[in-house]
From Swiss-Prot:
Belongs to the universal ribosomal protein uL13 family. GO terms for biological process: mitochondrial translation; negative regulation of translation; translation. PANTHER family: LARGE RIBOSOMAL SUBUNIT PROTEIN UL13M (PTHR11545:SF2), RIBOSOMAL PROTEIN L13 (PTHR11545). It comes from Homo sapiens (Human). GO terms for molecular function: mRNA binding; RNA binding; structural constituent of ribosome. The modification N-acetylserine is found at residue 2. Pfam families: Ribosomal_L13. This is Large ribosomal subunit protein uL13m. Component of the mitochondrial large ribosomal subunit (mt-LSU). Mature mammalian 55S mitochondrial ribosomes consist of a small (28S) and a large (39S) subunit. The 28S small subunit contains a 12S ribosomal RNA (12S mt-rRNA) and 30 different proteins. The 39S large subunit contains a 16S rRNA (16S mt-rRNA), a copy of mitochondrial valine transfer RNA (mt-tRNA(Val)), which plays an integral structural role, and 52 different proteins. Interacts with OXA1L. SUPFAM superfamilies: Ribosomal protein L13.
């Protein structure tokens, strides 16, 4: 095989692919796990820790993420200004109101390896609070990743046939009153 035919293959190997991930009703930890794999390039067979072969990840709807349980009030994000008395703590709900992309960004930042490549990988992360994505980013998208969790239906989204087909634990008698 000549070097002219091998060169395009090598460039295609290290080409950066743009992935889209929808964060609506998804836990930030699951989004971060999927995004960090793509940002590092762990999904590629040519991965090596010293090579920068990660892809771009675009996450939309970060305003509509979902925590399980009471984590909106119990999860605390801490920082320090470096000055005496500069320790700051803020709950997930307060941080989310201030900046809708901050929780997902911090989750992904924490899952990336703690080395000099981390800032470069974070530059390939594009977060958007709503469904609006700029045109120059939309034209680069190649693949949409599946959501990590299935979105549960609300009660008003069920059809009457699904409600009737749902198994009953107890059938009330005809003369039963609520």
């Amino acid at each position: 095989m000549s070097s002219f035919s091998r060169a395009p293959q090598q460039w295609a190997t290290f080409a950066r692919i743009w992935y889209l991930l929808d964060g609506k009703m998804q836990p930030p930890g699951k989004l971060a796990a999927m995004a960090s794999i793509r940002l590092q390039g762990l999904h590629k067979p040519v991965y090596h820790a010293l090579s920068d072969c990660g892809d771009h990840v675009v996450i939309m709807n970060t305003r509509h993420i979902a925590f399980s349980g009471n984590k909106w009030e119990q999860k605390v994000y801490s920082s320090h200004t470096g000055y005496p008395g500069g320790f700051r703590q803020v709950t997930a709900a307060q941080l989310h109101l201030r900046d809708p992309v901050a929780i997902v960004k911090l989750a992904i930042y924490g899952m990336l390896p703690k080395n000099l490549h981390r800032r470069t990988m974070m530059e390939r992360l594009h977060l958007f609070p709503d469904e609006y994505i700029p045109e120059d980013i939309l034209k680069n998208l190649v693949e949409e990743l599946p959501q990590p969790r299935k979105i549960p239906k609300r009660l008003d989204e069920y059809t009457q046939e699904e409600i009737d087909a749902f198994p009953r634990l107890w059938t009330p008698p005809e003369d039963y009153r609520l």
